[in-house]
Structure formats: structure tokens, C-alpha cells
Amino acid sequence: MKILILCSTLDLTKPFGATPSLWQLLKGFYEEGHELIVIPYHGHAINTLWWRSVQNPNYYEGVAMDKILRLFNKPSRRVSRISFIPIIARLLTKPKLYKIIIETLRQEKNIEAIMMIAVPLNQIKGLANKIKKQYAIPIIHYDLDVPTSLPSHGGFTFNYIKGADLSEYDSIIVPSEGSITELKELGARDAKVVHFGVDPDVYKPITVKKDIDFLFFGNGGSSRAKNLKMMITDPSSVLDYKFVVSGRDLGIDLGRSRILPPFSFSEWRNFCCRAKINLNVVRDLHANVFSTSTSRPFELAAMRCCVVSSPYMGL
């Protein structure tokens, strides 16, 4: 099957936590025999052995949007930020996306499905319906951020489902069983669960000296502050063990742990294999919504790491 994919980004240098999972998913599609054509919503097009990429028609608009988000990245400005971004995107970026998608469908001729992965739906509201007026083709949305992206939880950077029309899509795919009911209440015609997994070829263990007692890597501290305190802040303050922490926007007291800059992927694997115990400290929301999967336990297990995890409401 030939599939056209619109995804959040292909750029591993962008601070989007799901991008490694996205790469593995696309590689898996290729290995199952599918031909992929990928349009990134953010960042440059990147060709690989596993897919062809079409240039992002809104690259410079994305750069400008990054600057706007940094400018408005303050709680006092949060309401304004939520309200105007989807409007600007629908006016400026959606027409270019529609044009390049239609051009690609015409040129390739035999694309059998369109999949949108982790893109902000309220910024492209109406796009799927407009495409279907010309092409009778199934369009699926795969949201890697549910339940955080749901309007009831406010989203990550901004609330990108609020105001979207989920009925445009033939199916919505999410990694959270406990979120299905809300998706249907929001208008999804069909909702299915695909839990996270990992590519064992990517997460191969390496043999290195175990010189770190406890390791944690993750982005965002406030969303898991209680468990970080329990598993890192308090024990590192009283135990004579080496705690190492890395990530973005942690912003909380982490006791006597050693704080390192965010790892690249290859650095992270090396540190994981150096650690005697890897800490999986899940966000509160992912832990408390029933049967919501996160990729970290499977990544660590594939590398044969010893893992101590904060609890989940159904792993």
C-alpha cells in the first residue's frame, strides 16, 4: 500500500518527545511492505532508506511560529496564545498544505490512504473534508499525545484539539484506552487503540561499565513532580548513591542528583546502559488515565536495563 503521511516533524533536533517513536513507526510500515511519502508539518523534509519526503510548504511559517510561542510562553499570556494560533494557521498554513497534498495525490496517482500523525487538528480544520471532495480516500489521524492533547487536559504547548472536527477522520488512533470515551464525545466516528512499542534493532544494549547508580531522563518536571520528589529528590538527599538526571524544563528541586544537559539519542542509550537502575517517572496524567502506554518502559526493557517505575493505572 502507498500511504501519504502528514506528521508533526521528522527533525530529531526539535524538542518533540515523540519523534523517535515516529521514526520507528515509519520504519515499521516500510518493513511491512508499505511505500511511504511523508510531509513534515514542522521542520525540514528528511529522506531516509524507509520513506520519501516532500518539502514542508510552511517551513518559514513554522520558524516564525516558534518565535511567537517563545514570546508568549508565559502563564499570563496563555489564553491569548491558545486563541489566535489556530486562526493564523488556518489562514496561512492550511492552504499551502492542501495544495501540496493535492499535487502529491495527482502525481503519485495510486495513494491508497492518508495518515496524519501528531499534527494540531484545530490548525487544519476542514482540510480532510476538502481533500475528500476530490479524492475518495480514507484519512486517519494518529494522536501520539493523548490523553494530554485532549481539551479536558489542555494539551502540551497549546490546546490543539479544541475546536477541531474529529468527524472529518475515518478513524482516530491513540495509545490510551481510557481516552476513547472522550474522543467519541468530541465527535470521533471511530477510535482505536495502538499502544507504543519499540524497534529492537534501534534499542540494542551495549556493554559499558555500570558507573551510575540511578538515571532518569525526561522532559517536563511539573507534570510528574510528586513522583520525582519520591524517587529522586528525597532519596538523593539522604543516600550515598550517584543519581544522574537529564531532560528539558524540569524546573524542580532534584536534591543532590547530578543534572546534565538534554541527551542526544545516542548519548541517552549509552547512559541507560551505564546505569544500574533506570527510573521511569511517568507524567501524572499518563499514569492516572486507564491503560495509557508510554514508550519508556519498552525502550529500557529492550536495552535490558533494570527499571524501577512509578505506578500506572493499568500498564
Predicted regions and their residues:
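A short, histidine- and acid-enriched strand-loop-helix "catalytic/donor-clamping" loop
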Residues: I140-G155
